[in-house]
Amino acid sequence: MLNGIFSVEKNTGMLKNNFLITTTILFFSLIAHAQKDAKFSEQMKQEMCNKVKAAAQHAWQGYKQYAWGADDLKPLTKEPKLWYKKSMLMTPIDAFDTFTLLGLTDEAKEAKELILTKLDFNIDNDVQVFEITIRLLAGLITAYELDGNKKFLTLAVDLGNRLMPAFNSPTGMPYRYVHLQTGKTRDGINNPAEIGTLMMEFGKLSKLTGNNKYYNAAKKAIMLVYKKRSQLDLVGEQIDVKTGKWVNSRSHIGAYIDSYYEYLYKSWLLFGDKDFKTAFDTHNKAIKKHLITKTGKGWFMHQVDMNTGKIIGTTYGALEAFYAGLCAFAGDVETGRQIQEANYYMWTRFNIEPEEFNFIADTITSAYYILRPENLESCFYMYRLTGQLKYLWQGKVMVESIIDHCKNDVGFASLKNVQTLEKTNSMESFFFGETLKYAYLIFAPEATLDFKKVVLTTEAHPFKIEKK
């Protein structure tokens, strides 16, 4: 029984709050039950696609007017944001393939022209290898595969070469930061996600150039994390790339670990390398055994010690929501369904999903929402793999709540608090690259994205599957 919902309080104010919470939960539960079999017409799908297109155009117009050539738009102050000393065009690169997918040809043309005329990686700055890889390297590779302009590939190769020194550690696992001009590295305390979530991008670079150095470096790194797994087949949160020893044994599927698991499975799909499939299957079995808490609201994922399996935390949040889609995509639709029930509960329990909440106490532990895509991502996979209409209804609720609560006059703003709905001055590039893309794909015809031909990266950039 969840604390603070069903318990009777003497305090009248608390009683009213509990009544409102219970009423809200019952309301959304009734809606969800009714929507399982409710029709969702082709016209309704098209209307939702049009809403997403309009949202993308609105956000792009704000970027064009107030942040053209910058990394991001600050939507409240209407100012440009730079990640480093010089813009790396985060938003245009993340947005290009989304615009192409949505059929927004004018916007795609504008993003392409900006990238090809202004992008230059000769920057006197050290950068975070993980973020630059998943946003920029992936975006440029997809742009090349979609558009065919060789300058996209030239830029990708240049960036890949500037990032390669990160792998020059005693173990081969990359440092977190590398200087784009000097190759100097720093921060040897890394994590599985930032180590492993380079495989698709660097592997693809090898396939496109014929130079295996990128693939080999990335594979050595991700497989070393796998080799360092515990006897329970789990990995921890932090590892020293100089010694190969774990410095944090906290295990879960959230930040710092999440996309490591994702890339093991997707790298197998992309390249056909069975080593990745073996590693994923080993981990996935352990995750289901040690990390799932089954509740009446769905299956949540908790935190444990990687060595003992002892539960050390019961928080769940926006980032963890990806695992429902990954489970279903990997063939376990039932586990995916149960986790997605928890995901949707988390979204509707509050106005929008919080960054993190304690699913036992049913209270928020981190109240912000930064336009994250993972819940929509899992909703997309669940609908595509099951055809169940309830996922269209879930998608509709989530997309419309983002539009209702996050939209302003020049774009979309993150929320400081999902309960008060106070906005904050951020619209990151992944809103274009992932959130809008998944929002559209939920309702778009299946032919829009063919699972047999492409695999989506963690930043939702579609990579063409390599011929086996």
Where on the chain are the PLM-derived regions?
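Glycan-recognition and catalytic cores of secretory/periplasmic carbohydrate-active enzymes
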Residues: 35-468
